[in-house]
Amino acid sequence: MVHIVGAGPGDPELITVKGQRYLQAADVIIYAGSLVNPALLKICKTDAAIYNSATMTLAEVVAIIEKAEQEGKMTVRLHTGDPSVYGAIQEQMDAFTKKGIAYDVVPGVSSCFAVAAALKQEYTLPGISQTVIITRNEGRTPVPDMEKLRKLASHQATMCIYLSITMLDKVVAELIAGGYADDTPIAIVQKASWPEEKIVRGTLATIVNDIADKGIDRTAMIVVSRCLGADYELSRLYAPEFTHMFRKASQ
């Protein structure tokens, strides 16, 4: 069987308990070598066959897994973050289905949540934003017209923008064109949860200059939100006058 496992954002301790258990038991591991922390591989069996998918095609990945299945071996396909977010796992799962290979998916901590932890920031503040948009700027992978940054910006929601740091100037221009004000807070977090994590804060008007000398050109998340440093309303969940199914109002 194949277990598609989310490795989490980088810190080896942020893999799930189930993901760790599968990784420790696997006979074959195929990992996204350019993104997954190699420290995770230290918990694998000493005789496990380990492959770096960064140099492989889809057909090569599937061929290794198919051979492992024929030999009765368990495979872990180790992806960074959560496999369902920009993980390119659908084409793999479809290939497994066509070949009759059983598989499951173990979710992981996506980098947008590691970024929130690094920033010590909640993305959904009452009166500010109750929506989080996970997206990317258009690059080699096309983006549907209704999902272009300019149109998503009209919602004024918290936005977590993946895979776009090399196009930061274009991202900023699209966000402003879509309705965000120049003074909207923005944060760039590189390698969230890794020892070499970097955080740069600014506004849409300043951020391109703010990161110019920081050496941030890959593996970084862009977060734009009024939640970043904003005044906000207190949640009703803990208000003394608020009643819910577990607690009656005290005022």
What are the language-model segments listed below?
Residues 1-109, 208:
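Class I S-adenosyl-L-methionine
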Residues 2, 71-75, 131, 139, ...:
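A contiguous loop/helix-start segment that scaffolds small-molecule binding in enzyme catalytic cores
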Residues 15-17, 114-116, 171-172:
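Short hydrophobic alpha-helical segments that form membrane-spanning helices or hydrophobic packing faces
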Residues 20, 42, 67, 123-125, ...:
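Short secondary-structure boundary/capping segments
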Residues 37, 84-86, 112, 194, ...:
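Short, active-site-adjacent cap segments at secondary-structure transitions
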Residues 42-43, 118, 174:
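Residue-level signal for well-ordered alpha-helical positions
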